[in-house]
């Protein structure tokens, strides 16, 4: 953050921090940048720097005889014994994300802030040779579109393996600020690309698979890396109409908070046993998230079952933001105290390190209050083997991972697999795709590659990326396969200049196939950057229209790229546009993946995990309106409540082959169940009655086409009489991916449906089973349907602790 006025740090902290920290700040809000408008915090070097990392020496160092080095003691006892050795200044110096360590104890500095959204970021990459790159996977929104939970887990496991290899070389931390499990509620949001999409049940499954993949199979004894579920909670706006994320106060009903904005964090804490949670910049209902004990204690620890000694980190500078711009605290010292007492253990920033001494002097905090958070952090580090000897792999199975493991896991080519599985075929007129090598031999085919994504490299990665081993553009991929490529950028992402149109039309004229690759990228959607419009930007549609007019009988394929959707209704309705695909941010192998989908080496089976709205949607009501249900100018948010007509619906996705979907022998078309009977079933092994399976939705899936293909399924529920109005249009209750269904083969799809899938959330936030009639239906086509009648008395299956 930009701070122009300063005053000395409290004297008791100055001796330790004088060399590491600049002077502290004056307390007048008027002195600072207006963070109600500015969405990027100006972080100090101490916060953002990456530092060389090393392990404490428990064999020969000063700590060798202390309990912290006793591998038979509990992680908490070991951590608590270490923190008890700190002076107050040393304790405070280790409350920030860049912990300064304690040199007299042989405790190295530690950097909490490592990123792992879709690969290692904020690692200490070498300039060349070993450790100069790590695998860069597709952005989560594309990976989730594959509807393959095993794939999510595998990606996270690879990231964790590579992270531990880097950690062993002193180049990466033992915890990561990932995953981002906020839901992509409004299409203008700049960080939707980082998320699993707009559906909260998808986000919850993504959270579970990613977190358990990152943390390993035995996190209590051998934590691989500590995951951080972020951003908790109600965070999904960056800077829309100058409403800065740093100062937003989001008004959210208890109903929506319970039903939409927190279930994924509940699953992360209760089921995935996430070791860390990040509180968000924004306030919810008047209280900054990092100063809200209702969020951090009542919900997270008392209700969601957060692990006993898990720690909460602020988003970077969010502790400071409690003071400026929220104005919830009268000074930075007061803001630090508010955050500590609410349950924010570690400050990603420098507010704690500069001002906690003042908080203690003012009587707002005790040493014990501060110790609690640092003990929690170091408990996690103990679980990850930070203090353990490296004598045998049996002591810690991850301490001998090395560069060879990075090479091995990258060679599995899972980044490519994730991209090909996630790409969504939106339109395919007259089955023009795939452009097979038989019909279009590479040696005799000229491909015009046009548009601002046609030669994309870094663009493929989206945001939060580190060094990738390679970045394959669409142009390079087609050239590598032997096609002659006529490349012309034609226009930029947001350009209104037509100076490149002539070259683009010339490239198309002499080609056999025209591929336009465009859409949006991180110049329009990013952290601290929302879109104002969800129309295609600049003059891209004008160029596509000219290409369509000039195409004649040539195939014109449009690749719609970027994390958020754009209104492609004109392309959907243009008969000259042969095919339309959504490719997201496909990662290091993105060009290969796009090429192989187009040419049929891989067949598409992804489905949209966001709604493609008409452009007018973003102009109808404020993006800061958090109410999901339709009211006034708000036509309803997400596919669950939207009352308008989508361009392409959530769950849309085409195949190259055809599938016949029918009821299986185990499908019962009507099921009657008694609520009290359901709830009397044994469920002691489950964390919640909401997880109890009620029935299996089954269907026969037969490949009736000419190509082997994966098949993806979404099962939706709807009701018009169970519980009070208004009723959602439908909601997702399960999904799956069947791999490699051969031509003529029939597979049985089996999707379990749990108690929670039939529960509706009342105005108090309670999840309730109401008597009534539900319909379960397969995909958007609804060819397989099951009627479920719940009888008996309504029952609360999950009690929501309202905020007093």
Swiss-Prot record:
Q: Name one GO cellular component term.
A: extracellular region
Family matches, as Pfam families: Fn3-like, Glyco_hydro_3, Glyco_hydro_3_C
**Per its record, how is this protein called by name?**
Exo-1,4-beta-xylosidase xlnD
Q: What is its main location?
A: secreted
What SMART domains does the record point to?
Fn3_like
What GO terms are given for molecular function? alpha-L-arabinofuranosidase activity; xylan 1,4-beta-xylosidase activity
Question: EC number(s)?
Answer: 3.2.1.37
Q: List the signal peptide residues.
A: 1-26
Q: Please write the reaction equations for the catalytic activity of this protein.
A: Hydrolysis of (1->4)-beta-D-xylans, to remove successive D-xylose residues from the non-reducing termini
Supply the enzyme class, top level: hydrolase
Cite the annotated pathway.
Glycan degradation; xylan degradation
**Keyword S-adenosyl-L-methionine in annotation:** no
* BP GO terms, sorted: arabinan catabolic process; xylan catabolic process
**What UniProt keywords are attached to this protein's entry?**
Carbohydrate metabolism, Glycoprotein, Glycosidase, Hydrolase, Polysaccharide degradation, Secreted, Signal, Xylan degradation
Known function? Xylan 1,4-beta-xylosidase involved in the hydrolysis of xylan, a major structural heterogeneous polysaccharide found in plant biomass representing the second most abundant polysaccharide in the biosphere, after cellulose.
Catalytic residues as annotated in Swiss-Prot or TrEMBL = 315
Family assignment? Answer: Belongs to the glycosyl hydrolase 3 family.
Cross-referenced PANTHER family: EXO-1,4-BETA-XYLOSIDASE XLND, SUGAR HYDROLASE-RELATED
Q: Which residues carry attached sugars according to the database record? A: 29, 124, 148, 242, 251, 357, 390, 413, 444, 455, 573, 665, 696, 718
